[in-house]
């Protein structure tokens, strides 16, 4: 594979914005077709911000139409584009209106799922590195969050895109969602962020305790991927150091027995079978359904993790078709599925 030369990026940007950037689709999306229910001057009141060469940051950009947007982007050749809210006035005229009159009125609800937040449940990569093994985490997260947004909240218009570097974004674009208050947005985020944990978790996971319906439905999705991902690709029960982290979370009544069985086993899959048998034993004792998938997924935050979710209207998130200049790569986002 040919090595990328960062000094070529400015010329590549010019080529990209002149020949490849999907201006028509971009404008149609952010103008929502200009149909019924879309306020007058909707696109003109949308804020854009550009990051240029040498990290020069320009806010409060706005455009009359697709043609103006196209001309300015080909003139500026931004390294990064952020999309903001739709305001009461044109953002490029925000200094000309009365103090306090310039207010955000609409904004999509956007979730940013970052692979680095899963470093405690992947062993193949870390930081911004991604491979086919750990990308399974993104697949699980997408299916979990998308199911909840669709079935639990009834949101219809959801755009999943690759962030261009180390994760995915979900843009929820329903008209009703774009007008949600900060309090309601925070409530949605809280609902989807029930599980907290990681390597610092000390609380034992009681496999028989009642589980929130969102987590239960998430576990059902995880089951389709768990053994292949956790036991084969990540080999989470490979050695004593690894399995001790798991056993620290199980009830004391089965801890010693599992420790002995784990030492006699030769693979993560074999140790997993012992863990499932222990869960079944707990179920018979307590007469309450148990599921080891639920315990491990909850403890290690496999269900869902989101970062940079702005519950307000004033924040901006990276555009769906951009160059990430600092890593010198094309970040043409594409729909995941």
Task: Go through each PLM region and give its residues.
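A residue-level signal for conserved active-site and pocket-lining positions in enzyme catalytic cores
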Residues: 111, 170, 319
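Short, conserved alpha-helical segments within structured domains
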Residues: 162-168, 315
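Active-site lining segments that contact anionic ligands and/or coordinate catalytic metals
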Residues: 314-316, 330
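A short beta-strand motif that forms the metal-chelation/ATP-contact edge
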Residues: 168-175
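Active-site/pore-lining binding-face segments in mid-to-C-terminal subdomains
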Residues: 316-317, 322
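Low-complexity, glycine/alanine/valine/leucine- and proline-rich hydrophobic stretches
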Residues: 332-337
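Signature for HUH/AEP ssDNA processing cores
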Residues: 1-163, 175-182, 187-189, 194-299, ...
